[in-house]
């Protein structure tokens, strides 16, 4: 993966479209250079470990929001494909995390990215509410 391309994408949506990313969630595995690069530019990086304890509640909420059609993804075919490729691992404590299904070569990266975004939302929910003028979007 070319992390420079990812950084360029974040800068492009900020500079060209005035979309300001308050937090960027990331999996710490093999991303040290990119994390430092993004911090130097001014992005607030939030580490999200890809384990059941970390991802369980956000993943369950994402599932509920997808069912309730609260997630707008414009029927993106790549994200839809990644979501369809994603299966659930459940531990003995009923915590869940995403895994690849039977097709081990299939990609789940888009689904995992969305779950990471939900993990950041869970961690920074009060900041999100403040950005919305003190109330949740669906109130």
Residue ranges and their predicted role:
Residues 1-50, 60, 73, 77-139:
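RNase H-like, metal-dependent nuclease domains and their acidic two-metal-ion catalytic environment used
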Residues 54-63:
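Short, charged, surface-exposed secondary-structure boundary motifs
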Residues 62-70:
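Active-site proximal helix-loop segment of RNase H-like, two-metal nucleases, encompassing DDE(D)
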């Amino acid at each position: 993966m070319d992390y420079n391309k990812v950084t360029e994408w974040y800068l492009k949506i900020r500079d060209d479209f005035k979309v300001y990313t308050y937090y960027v969630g990331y999996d710490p595995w093999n991303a040290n250079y990119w994390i430092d690069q993004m911090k130097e530019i001014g992005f607030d990086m939030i580490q999200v470990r890809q384990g059941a304890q970390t991802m369980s509640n956000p993943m369950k909420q994402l599932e509920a929001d997808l069912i309730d059609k609260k997630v707008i993804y414009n029927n993106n075919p790549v994200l839809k494909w990644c979501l369809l490729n994603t299966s659930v691992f459940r531990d003995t404590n009923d915590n869940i995390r995403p895994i690849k299904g039977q097709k081990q070569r299939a990609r789940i990266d888009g689904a995992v990215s969305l779950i990471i975004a939900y993990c950041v939302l869970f961690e920074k929910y009060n900041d999100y509410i403040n950005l919305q003028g003190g109330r949740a979007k669906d109130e």
